[in-house]
């Protein structure tokens, strides 16, 4: 257990360097998450006989990836950075990977911002290619938590988004303080558990859009629990009633999921 407790003292978040640029494990895990999510989508399309071509799915994931990156970064800038004014007056800095002449990559992404970017990209894609948005979103409802699992493991390997100080025996020492490995809690609850639930439930879904609505609700419960073990975002702390920004945004997401579920269910029962 001691080796586990001090894992950060023995693990380098940089996987390797190439031409002087450091490649972090987080970046590799992000790429792995995307590749596996796409592979899962293609598996489900074939397994469940969903009328979507492989080429169209590739195009969709390309659109979505752009939306996710833009949304995640802008969400962090506007909500979490504490320097929104600086970035808005110097927008070129939002995606600038250099700092004082050193390549540091793009740091700071927001999950809920990524969700907004993902939804906008899906809407635009479906209008462009005349696809059923709810059918695509249901497919993503299973693939997202599958890939998300590896994204949170990437956060753990990158030594970021630490948990709160604790005395549990499996705590990770971070700058001399024992903390919850909350990134792994999130990988399990927000990723793996939700994936398994929706993967198994997909055979019983009653209408298109049901899975993505359930995902929004399930994610809220999982994130709400995990936030009690995760250190609040620096500069924000607790917002109201002892809740973090992540919990508040997740509650909004849950409300939207419930609204969508009820609306689509009523439409389904009228058929």
Curated annotation (Swiss-Prot):
Q: Which residues form a coiled coil?
A: none
Which enzyme class, named as a word? transferase
Q: Which GO terms describe its biological process?
A: lipoprotein biosynthetic process
Q: Which residues cross the membrane?
A: 18-38, 60-80, 103-123, 136-156, 181-201, 209-229, 238-258
Where found, per UniProt? Cell inner membrane
Q: Does the keyword Transferase apply?
A: yes
Output the superkingdom of the source species: Bacteria
The pathway where this protein functions is: Protein modification; lipoprotein biosynthesis (diacylglyceryl transfer)
- Report the EC code(s) recorded for this entry: 2.5.1.145
- UniProt cross-references to InterPro entries, sorted A to Z: Lgt
Name the positions where a 1,2-diacyl-sn-glycero-3-phospho-(1'-sn-glycerol) binds: 152
Q: What's one Pfam family here?
A: LGT
GO CC, any one term: plasma membrane
**Keywords on record:** Cell inner membrane, Cell membrane, Membrane, Transferase, Transmembrane, Transmembrane helix
Q: Does this UniProt record's set of keywords contain Cell membrane? A: yes
Q: Which GO terms describe its molecular function?
A: phosphatidylglycerol-prolipoprotein diacylglyceryl transferase activity
Q: Which HAMAP family match?
A: Lgt
Which family would the database say this protein is a member of?
Answer: Belongs to the Lgt family.
Q: What does this protein do?
A: Catalyzes the transfer of the diacylglyceryl group from phosphatidylglycerol to the sulfhydryl group of the N-terminal cysteine of a prolipoprotein, the first step in the formation of mature lipoproteins.
Record-given protein name: Phosphatidylglycerol--prolipoprotein diacylglyceryl transferase
- Gene name, per UniProt, is lgt
